[in-house]
């Protein structure tokens, strides 16, 4: 194992022991803010510490077996040789695991997200496909036990959505969905196509991490124009009775956010402000991310909204992710919420990029 990696693990072991002591300290236990913070850090550090402890045990076993290779008993030497082989294999596996565990964490991975889906080229068919994508992500969220709430929707004339915005809340939401941003293309025969010709349409997806209070950008109220209007669409008898829907325009950037799903104007405003903060944060970070991706020629992770990232081909039952040249013939499963079939290989490729960068 590299000396730099060993040094990091020794520091982490010291921190683990320190955290163990802190979590048993009566003064810390009585301060719930500190206790929760230390508990979260402990939960992150403990698996790495356990893997490092196992690595050290196997390293000791290897040294013991190597010493037996000099024994005069041939049977003992043969047994020791097998133990050396097994220990070396275990060490390689554990070292790879520890390297992955020590990769820099994206601080946004644990955040909730705003999911934006917009119809692009293709007219009605693009709007219908936006609806298909929204159902795909809704089913994926349901499988993972996440909570999804619609903030704003603009339905297409023949089904689907010209635009739909949702908030997704749960464990590691951004960590799973962050590589879904980009242009999604569909190739299929529309129901209105009498000649049976395959049409190509596209939608854009944006996944924005929801900032917490500390990370939220400070927004000058003078930079905002706030309009109220009557909600339209789903909502039962309450719709159109009160001006509960909110539209906020950030004048310096021209960004517009709307929220109409809550019955309370106050709740709609709070959701809209959180979404606006996420969009302003995204503007700041996107340029830096694109520069890094360009410099390192990353296949995954640029998050460029205009980049065509995936094609859904209905006649062939095929889904292709163009960033990693991944082709799967399981279109129905993926659209039914089995998005992990694409997400997991993307995350693996991203980790490989990070490991390569660590080796530079």
Curated annotation (Swiss-Prot):
Processing after translation: Methylated by PrmC. Methylation increases the termination efficiency of RF1.
Domain of life of the organism encoding this protein: Bacteria
Keyword Cytoplasm part of the UniProt annotation: yes
Record-listed N5-methylglutamine modification sites: 237
Subcellular location: Cytoplasm
Keywords in alphabetical order: Cytoplasm, Methylation, Protein biosynthesis
Pfam families: PCRF (PF03462), RF-1 (PF00472)
Gene Ontology cellular component annotations, sorted alphabetically: cytoplasm
Coiled-coil regions, chain positions: none
GO molecular-function term, one example from the UniProt record: translation release factor activity, codon specific
Record's function text: Peptide chain release factor 1 directs the termination of translation in response to the peptide chain termination codons UAG and UAA.
Family: Belongs to the prokaryotic/mitochondrial release factor family.
Protein name, as recorded: Peptide chain release factor 1
Gene name of the encoded protein: prfA
């Amino acid at each position: 194992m590299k000396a730099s990696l060993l040094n990091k693990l020794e520091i982490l072991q010291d921190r683990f022991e320190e955290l163990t002591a802190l979590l048993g300290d009566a003064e810390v236990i009585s301060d719930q803010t500190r206790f929760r913070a230390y508990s979260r850090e402990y939960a992150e550090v403990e698996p790495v510490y356990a893997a490092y402890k196992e690595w050290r045990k196997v390293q000791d076993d290897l040294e013991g077996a190597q010493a037996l290779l000099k024994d005069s008993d041939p049977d003992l030497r043969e047994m020791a040789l097998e133990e050396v082989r097994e220990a070396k294999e275990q060490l390689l596996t554990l070292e790879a695991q520890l390297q992955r565990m020590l990769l820099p964490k994206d601080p946004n991975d644990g955040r909730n997200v705003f999911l934006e889906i917009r119809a692009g080229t293709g007219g009605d068919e693009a709007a219908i496909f936006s609806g298909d994508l929204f159902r795909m992500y809704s089913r994926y969220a349901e499988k993972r036990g996440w909570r999804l709430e619609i903030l704003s929707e603009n339905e297409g004339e023949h089904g689907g959505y010209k635009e739909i915005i949702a908030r997704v809340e749960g464990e590691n939401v951004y960590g799973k969905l962050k590589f879904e941003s980009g242009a999604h293309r569909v190739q299929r025969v529309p129901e209105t196509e009498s000649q049976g010709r395959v049409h190509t349409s596209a939608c854009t997806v944006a996944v924005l991490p929801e900032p917490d209070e500390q990370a939220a950008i400070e927004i000058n109220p003078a930079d905002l124009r706030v309009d109220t209007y009557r909600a339209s669409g789903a909502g039962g008898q309450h719709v159109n009775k009160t001006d509960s829907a909110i539209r906020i325009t950030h004048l310096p950037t021209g960004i517009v956010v709307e929220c109409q799903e809550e019955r309370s104007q106050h709740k709609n405003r709070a959701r809209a402000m959180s979404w606006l903060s996420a969009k302003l944060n995204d503007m700041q970070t996107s340029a830096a991310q694109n520069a890094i991706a360009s410099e390192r020629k990353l296949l995954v992770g640029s998050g460029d909204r205009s980049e065509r990232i995936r094609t859904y081909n209905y006649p062939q039952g095929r889904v292709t992710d163009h960033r990693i040249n991944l082709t799967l013939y399981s279109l129905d499963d993926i659209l039914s919420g089995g998005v992990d079939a694409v997400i997991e290989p993307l995350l693996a490729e991203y980790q490989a990029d990070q490991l390569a960068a660590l080796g530079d």
